[in-house]
Every structure is written in C-alpha cells, then in structure tokens.
Amino acid sequence: MCGIVGMFRLQAGRPVDAALVAAMNQAQYHRGPDEGDQYIDEQVGLGHRRLSIIDLASGQQPMIDESGRYVLIFNGEIYNFMALRAELETLGHVFKTHCDTEVI
C-alpha cells in the first residue's frame, strides 16, 4: 500500500515547510519503497510514496493534470481504468503514462 502525506496552510504568507513535508514523506518509506516525490505550492504540500503495481515505469505521483491546474495523489487500484482511459481519449484527453491514476 502506498503512503500519502499532505499539509495545507490557511494563512496566506505562511508557506508550507518543504523540509517538513519531505520528512513526513520519508517517514513512510516502508509504505512505498519504489519511489517517492512531493509537490510544494505556497499553501499546499503533498507527498507520495509509491508501491508500484500498474505501470511500473511511469506512474510517479503527485500527478499533475494536462492543464497544470490540478495536482493529485492517489492510493488504490482502478480496475476498469482501461475502459475509462479509452472513453477519455475519445473526448480528446492525452495521457502521459499507462497508470490507472491518470484517469482520475
């Protein structure tokens, strides 16, 4: 099972502590030894430790959508992701990976 961490600052001008998010993420290394990364914004910090099951090579998270507006971390498995992916491709979405997370 993967590991997920997050931090949100309500007060503008008090940015998220990137070192703290990194330390929280590292503390759950055992939950996702395959890889880990984080996303830091002014008020949001997200971390993810990955246990690779589907798309072993390119399913890194946090994942950013094609518009750059949304950042996602996810743990689980989407069993019908191939059907969802095909439907989204007919609507014009372009995928960067073969990971089930990207259909969200």
Short names for language-model regions:
Residues M1-I104:
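N-terminus-centric sequence/structural signature that marks the extreme N-terminus
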